[in-house]
A protein has these predicted regions:
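Polyanionic (Asp/Glu-rich) segments that form extended negatively charged tracts
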Residues: 1-2
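Short beta-strand-alpha-helix junction that forms the catalytic/metal-binding core
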Residues: 115, 127-153
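C-terminal, well-folded lobe of enzymatic/effector domains
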Residues: 6, 170-213
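Short, well-ordered loop/turn and helix-capping segments at boundaries between secondary-structure elements
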Residues: 12, 16-20, 40, 123-127, ...
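Polybasic, low-complexity binding patches
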Residues: 131-135, 153-179
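Short, mixed-charge aromatic SLiMs
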Residues: 8-24, 38-39, 115, 119, ...
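Intrinsically disordered, low-complexity N-proximal targeting/linker segments that flank membranes
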Residues: 18-118, 125
Length: 213
């Protein structure tokens, strides 16, 4: 039976192996490493798996890992999703819909259900400012929202989106580190600074979520 402590360790192992691409490449060798740890360790399964992580796999999540160009549903977004589900985070515009329930919506052909990745700085905003479109695709610029909310925001600038939110909606957005605390970093000319600012806060929150000192 998995207790709370072991569940925390398993969560850490799953998220860190995803973030670090542990199972890319020589998969059989990697699987054998963890199987051996489970067989030989006298500790509970979760702790045994975490102990078997290499030093670079087990380290804290760094802000720079959230600044690299990433697929919309890549490993970093999967970890962000797990964190938001644990926080019982909600859609910014619809308080009745949690991030978890959006992903579980039936009858929608997309892998994420009614949940989608929202670019805080829209791609059009950045390309209009002379940046390459790839610059938008980094986890530090991603938020998870409903498809309808994402469509509502469209290609509006983030400071315009923030102005349109009610106080309660701003609270829900604040869970994902979007809000007044960003100050004038929400202007397109400070995009890099915004991403660095938000990446630092996301990394801190994810490390706390995973129980990493």
């Amino acid at each position: 039976q998995v207790g709370p402590d072991d569940e925390q360790q398993l969560k850490r192992w799953l998220c860190l192996t995803a973030m670090r691409g542990t199972f890319q490449g020589s998969v059989e060798t990697t699987i054998n490493r963890f199987l051996r740890a489970l067989k030989e360790s006298k500790r509970k399964p979760g702790a045994a798996l975490v102990d078997a992580l290499h030093k670079d796999e087990a380290r804290r999540i760094r802000p720079d890992e959230l600044l690299h160009v990433s697929p919309l549903w890549g490993s970093a977004v999967q970890v962000l999703h797990a964190w938001l589900v644990a926080r019982t985070a909600k859609d910014w515009l619809d308080e009745d819909r949690t991030i978890d329930s959006l992903a579980r919506t039936e009858g929608i052909k997309y892998p994420g259900g009614d949940l989608t990745v929202h670019h805080i700085f829209a791609r059009k905003v950045l390309t209009d400012a002379g940046l390459r479109i790839e610059a938008a695709n980094r986890p530090a610029n991603f938020a998870l929202l409903s498809r309808s909310t994402n469509a509502e925001f469209g290609a509006r600038t983030p400071d315009d989106v923030l102005r349109s939110l009610t106080p309660d909606q701003r609270k829900r957005a604040g869970v994902q580190f979007f809000g007044e605390a960003a100050g004038d970093r929400l202007r397109h000319e400070r995009y890099e600074e915004f991403c660095e600012w938000r990446a630092a806060r996301l990394a801190e929150a994810l490390n706390e979520f995973l129980g990493i000192d």
